[in-house]
Structures are given as structure tokens and as C-alpha cells.
């Protein structure tokens, strides 16, 4: 590791192969927590490259437990986290809307690292079993068109990174890598990042990892979700090309809400918020979910504009289909 660390500290990027080999050394338990921490901090100070992200993602995905699903055209909408906005679980709530709208959602996530409630925490509060074996998860996905994939349970290699990440308490390359390593092969993806400087880079990494279409979003203030306030920036991967865009709520037919109005709490509180949204209760939480689900429909290619995606999201919720999708998952991802 010494040579790689010196290279990074000198401001030079590691190749994909170098990163892949170093990641495999970590996965095999050959490096100490201190060595892993120094490596993560050095990468953060230098700035992560596409080759480093790709090499790490390939190593971690290869080490993941495979999900033997029969479904194709899978999508995920998880974000990097680390924005410290303390919002409710936006992408998790939106996942039910997307699944109800006909998108095969392989929702990948974890417990909270820097927030009060991660996707795993809120879904566990809703009665979802985080620890089903891979074969059962595949059955749930095939039947419901939605499954929650608990990263901690499906990425045994993460046990070497998690304690270090908790102690560092800062976003690292691991936040950027998490959304890239879904155990189910993805065709499309909506990926939220708290790093607007990495929008184009992340979209190109997704292209290299085989995504057919993807959208990488950073909201106002570095939120890793689309925000119905301020300016949103995104990179769109479409037809093999990456383009950069921006929009405000008014540009997609929405009124602005305040950040304070979408703050969440601990898992039980966020679970109630999620249910209220799917029950179509008018609120800033609903508007934020509609925006992000609409963006997801657009990222998936199901609609030809963000505005059309928002309209579809409103329709799906109003018809009760999103709430029914929650009930379906609660009935199947149990035991």
C-alpha cells in the first residue's frame, strides 16, 4: 500500500487496476484500520478520479453476494449520503412511487452513517426484513418488482470499511462507491450525490459500468436529492453521451418549499412521513417525493421530460398504487 499512498499524496491518480488491487487487499483483511483511514483521507484530499471509482466499484461488486433474479431492466435510485441535510428518506419514499409506476426497483441502501435515519433504518421500522437470503430476495423482486437490498448484508467486504467510516465522520470515496455496486445488474439509475463537482465524472463511471441511461443529481446546498428549492444540477447519460443541465422547481411546474419543511427525524418518524406521502397527504414531503420520483421516471426513460415524470408520480400516488406497493413489500419481504 505504501507506493499507492505516496502516489495519491503526491496528487497523482491511481489506475483502475491499481485501485482494484488495493481494494482486494482491503477486502482480504490485509490492511489495518489506520491504513484504510489514511488511504480514504488521502483520496479525499486529492480528489477521486474516474479510474479510482471504477476500480473500487468493480472489486466491491465482484465480492458482493449475487441475487439470482429473473427480472431485467432494473433500476436503483440510492444516493451517496453525507449531505447532512437531515431530510426525510426521500429516495426510499420515491422508490415505492417508481415501482408502482412500472419500474423494476432494486433499492440498494444501508443504515445511517451521517444522518439520523438511513434507508435500512426506515424500512426496518416499516417491518421490512433486512436479512433475507439472496434467493428469497430474488423471489421478492420477481414478484413485487421492488426489493430492498441491505448493503451490509450483501457486501461482506464492507465490514473492513464501515468502522473506519463511522470514526472519520466525513464523506469519502466509499459514499461515492456505494450507489455503484448494486448486487443486481442495473440498466438505468438515478444517483444523488452531495458532490456537484463530480456529476459528470460519476455519469461517465456509470457509463463505464454498463448503464444504458442514468441521471446524476445534486440539489441546492449539496443535497444528494433533487430539491424543490434553489438550483438543481444534473448530468444525464443518454445514448452513450453525458450532458450537463440545471433546473429550478418553477422550471418543472412546481412551487418551492423550504429545507426546514422537509427535515426528518429518527426512523419511526421518517416511517410515518413515508406512509403519509404514499397516502397522498399534502405536504412539502409529498412535493419533494413527487419531484424525485419524477426525476426517476425520466432517468429510467419512461417519460421524455422531468415535468412528465412529475405528472406520472402524482398520478401513481393519487391512485393509491404507491401505497399498495408498500403493502406488497411488507407482505413479501418478511420472515
Swiss-Prot record:
Pathway: Amino-acid biosynthesis; L-tryptophan biosynthesis; L-tryptophan from chorismate: step 2/5. The keyword Glycosyltransferase applies. InterPro entries: Anthranilate_Pribosyl_Tfrase, Glycosyl_Trfase_fam3, Glycosyl_Trfase_fam3_N_dom, Glycosyl_Trfase_fam3_N_dom_sf, Nuc_phospho_transferase. 5-phospho-alpha-D-ribose 1-diphosphate binds at residues 79, 82-83, 87, 89-92, 107-115, 119. It comes from the Bacteria. Anthranilate 1 binds at residues 79, 110. Mg(2+) 2 binds at residues 224-225. One of its GO terms (cellular component) is cytosol. It is an enzyme of class 2 (transferase). Its cofactor is Mg(2+). Its EC number is 2.4.2.18. Mg(2+) 1 binds at residues 91, 225. Homodimer. Belongs to the anthranilate phosphoribosyltransferase family. HAMAP family: TrpD. This is Anthranilate phosphoribosyltransferase. It comes from Lactococcus lactis subsp. cremoris (strain MG1363).
Amino acid at each position: 500500500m505504501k507506493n499507492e499512498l505516496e502516489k495519491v499524496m503526491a496528487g497523482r491518480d491511481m489506475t483502475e487496476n491499481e485501485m482494484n488491487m488495493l481494494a482486494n487487499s482491503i477486502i482480504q483483511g490485509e490492511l489495518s484500520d489506520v491504513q484504510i483511514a489514511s488511504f480514504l483521507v488521502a483520496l479525499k484530499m486529492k480528489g477521486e478520479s474516474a479510474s479510482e471509482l471504477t476500480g473500487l466499484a468493480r472489486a466491491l461488486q465482484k465480492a458482493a453476494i449475487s441475487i439470482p433474479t429473473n427480472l431485467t431492466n432494473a433500476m436503483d435510485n440510492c444516493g451517496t449520503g453525507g449531505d447532512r441535510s437531515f431530510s426525510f428518506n426521500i429516495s426510499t419514499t420515491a422508490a415505492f412511487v417508481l415501482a408502482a409506476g412500472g419500474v423494476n426497483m432494486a433499492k440498494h441502501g444501508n443504515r445511517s452513517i451521517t444522518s439520523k435515519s438511513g434507508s435500512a433504518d426506515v424500512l426496518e421500522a416499516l417491518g421490512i426484513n433486512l436479512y433475507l437470503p439472496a434467493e428469497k430476495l430474488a423471489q421478492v423482486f420477481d414478484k413485487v418488482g421492488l426489493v430492498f437490498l441491505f448493503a451490509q448484508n450483501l457486501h461482506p467486504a464492507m465490514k473492513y470499511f464501515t468502522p473506519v467510516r463511522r470514526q472519520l465522520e466525513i464523506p469519502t470515496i466509499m459514499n461515492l462507491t456505494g450507489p455503484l455496486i448494486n448486487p443486481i445488474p442495473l440498466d438505468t439509475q438515478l444517483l444523488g450525490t452531495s458532490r456537484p463537482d463530480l456529476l459528470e465524472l460519476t455519469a461517465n463511471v456509470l457509463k463505464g459500468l454498463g448503464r444504458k441511461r442514468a441521471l446524476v443529481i445534486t440539489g441546492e446546498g449539496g443535497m444528494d436529492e433533487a430539491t424543490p428549492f434553489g438550483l438543481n444540477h444534473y448530468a444525464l447519460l443518454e445514448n452513450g453521451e453525458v450532458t450537463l443541465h440545471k433546473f429550478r422547481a418553477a422550471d418543472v411546474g412546481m412551487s418551492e418549499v423550504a429545507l426546514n419543511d422537509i427535515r426528518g427525524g429518527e426512523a419511526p418518524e421518517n416511517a410515518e412521513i413515508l406512509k403519509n406521502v404514499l397516502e397522498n397527504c399534502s405536504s412539502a414531503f409529498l412535493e419533494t417525493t413527487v419531484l424525485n420520483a419524477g426525476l426517476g421516471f425520466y432517468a429510467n426513460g419512461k417519460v421524455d421530460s422531468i415535468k412528465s415524470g412529475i405528472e406520472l408520480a402524482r398520478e401513481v400516488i393519487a391512485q393509491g398504487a404507491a401505497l399498495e406497493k408498500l403493502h406488497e413489500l411488507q407482505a413479501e419481504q418478511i420472515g
